[in-house]
Swiss-Prot record:
GO terms for biological process: translation. This is Small ribosomal subunit protein eS24. GO terms for molecular function: rRNA binding; structural constituent of ribosome. Pfam families: Ribosomal_S24e (PF01282). Keywords: Ribonucleoprotein, Ribosomal protein, RNA-binding, rRNA-binding. InterPro entries: Nucleotide-bd_a/b_plait_sf, Ribosomal_eS24, Ribosomal_eS24_CS, Ribosomal_uL23/eL15/eS24_sf. It comes from Pyrococcus furiosus (strain ATCC 43587 / DSM 3638 / JCM 8422 / Vc1).
Length: 99
């Protein structure tokens, strides 16, 4: 798996970096969010506690997936802005009992 950064936008108003990337994974299935997040955090020297993978999109018959991630300046801002289901999906918060 190889990740290529296509664009990084600095959103100072919200306090985050917006990262657009492509994943090359010939002969392999679409990589998991956990694997992609780990590689992005290592590549860009980000904090794993404030980095969220918004989506990874794969296309039929292609070994290229496109993704979008957000890296926040603070955990408080991330918890305020991001929808709960995204935070649960990325493993940043626990799912509430009974849901």
């Amino acid at each position: 798996m190889e990740i290529r950064i296509k664009e990084i936008k600095e959103n100072k108003l919200i306090g985050r970096k917006e990262i657009y990337f492509e994943i090359y994974h010939p002969g392999e299935p679409t990589p998991s969010r956990k694997d992609v997040k780990g590689k992005l955090v290592a590549m860009l020297d980000l904090n794993p506690e404030t980095t969220v993978i918004q989506y990874i999109r794969s296309y039929f018959g292609s070994y290229i997936s496109k993704g979008y991630a957000k890296a926040y300046d603070s955990k408080e801002r991330m918890l305020y802005i991001e929808p709960e289901y995204i935070l649960i999906r990325d493993g940043l918060i626990e799912k509430k009992e009974g849901e």
